[in-house]
Amino acid sequence: MTVFTRVRNPAHARVLSHLDSLESEAVHIFREVAGEFERPVILFSGGKDSILMLHLALKAFAPAPVPFTLLHVDTGHNFPEVLAYRDRVVAEHGLRLHVASVQDYIDAGKLRERPDGTRNPLQTVPLTEAIQQHRFDAVFGGGRRDEEKARAKERVFSLRDEFSQWDPRRQRPELWQLYNGRHAPGEHVRVFPISNWTELDVWQYIEREGIELPEIYFAHEREVFNRNGMWLTAGHWGGPKEHERTETRQVRYRTVGDMSCTGAVDSDATTLDAVITEIAASRLTERGATRADDKMSEAAMEDRKREGYF
């Protein structure tokens, strides 16, 4: 009888760390999209998740340039620090950036301002029309499953119909990291390369890689006011109202979106280590703690996704 003996060579037994495994998965997804699609685009707002996506895309194709265009839906109520960071990064890497302006749609009479002043729900029309105009067939987004329940059930490759609408019943199985990008003319696929990352993973990776972030993510003094339990930034977008009082507090932002619906959190975390410690101790997701637009209804995010939102 022949006996086969398995020989293990420690030199070839390298085990990927948790962060290395997540990075490898994301890099694979970027390369898969580059091979399957003709006109991919990365949604890039200058927020931490889109910054992470761009960093991973740069790694996936280095030393060649990133073969994707960037797209930002500008509400006109974005944080100035984040826009400045966005423009600096685009210039630094010689990237192409398309900006779809909500203000342009309001000026043209295609959209109306909401009574509460927020423009976050108004992003859907500029986004979907930009996708149609530029014929993008794959759209990278920074959504993560730990953020919100609608995002938790969405696939990495998320098929959208010719109206950019999402139907959860049309989702495809994704066994063994095999992704099906097939779509009919006029349809496109939303792609979420960091879907399996948590907020803590994101920050630990940012620390490991030495990725620069806008200062808004670290504790600083800011003039804010309280609305429905959230500390919102005072500004030109229409806040605060007459009965709302502003005060100066030391805060930071866990997630960044429209100023009118993104709440700051009290914090003294001025370094990456301090932020990571703070997040590890938190029992609330970043969107659950700081996004007013997710509190409009129990299914607010899923309703917007069905209409074409990120």
Task: Identify what each model region corresponds to.
Residues 1-310:
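Nucleotide-activated chemistry modules centered on ATP-dependent adenylation/adenylyltransferase
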